[in-house]
Each structure stands twice: as C-alpha cells, then as structure tokens.
C-alpha cells in the first residue's frame, strides 16, 4: 500500500501521493523551487495517522512545476427591455506542484 497524505492549502484539502502532480491556489514561489506543506491533516499507508487537527511533525515536500491561469470564466448580467448589460471575465491563477516526499 502506497503512502498518501491529506494536506491543507489554499483553503482546501487535497489528497496527495509521491510523484503526483496537483493544482493548487497560487503560491508565491518561483517555478523550479521546492515548497513545503506543513498543514498535514492525515498520513495513510501501512499505519494511518489522523491529526487532531494536524499531524505533529509531518510535512509534504513538492517542487513547483509552473504557474499559470485557468480558462476564462465569463459572467454576463442584463436587464430585460432596458438596454443595460454587463460582461465580465475572470481567470483564476494556479500553481502546479509535483509531490516529492511525504515525511511523517
């Protein structure tokens, strides 16, 4: 059974395994640098450890592969019969991280 962990980042919880690529909310880290996630909620494998609320001393290390933006989401509001309309777009920034190690 492979080791996995559940980490908290960007207001979300993400299940990760070594070698997996994950997309998280934008982190202020350059591409190619390592990033450490200290908020580990659960470490699973041969023996599962559940934190209360976090697992003490557990970290997950990954490498930032790239920074980018998601596809554009377009919102359009209008008032019928008034000739009033508003169009707005948004592209959410993200960071792609490849998980290197889970230290429990």
Curated annotation (Swiss-Prot):
GO terms for cellular component: cytoplasm; ribonucleoprotein complex; ribosome. It comes from Streptococcus gordonii (strain Challis / ATCC 35105 / BCRC 15272 / CH1 / DL1 / V288). One of its GO terms (molecular function) is rRNA binding. PROSITE patterns: RIBOSOMAL_L21 (PS01169). Keywords: Ribonucleoprotein, Ribosomal protein, RNA-binding, rRNA-binding. The lineage of its organism: Bacteria, Bacillati, Bacillota, Bacilli, Lactobacillales. This is Large ribosomal subunit protein bL21. GO terms for biological process: translation. Part of the 50S ribosomal subunit. Contacts protein L20. Belongs to the bacterial ribosomal protein bL21 family. The keyword DNA-binding does not apply. Signal peptide: none annotated. The keyword Secreted does not apply. This protein binds to 23S rRNA in the presence of protein L20. Pfam families: Ribosomal_L21p.
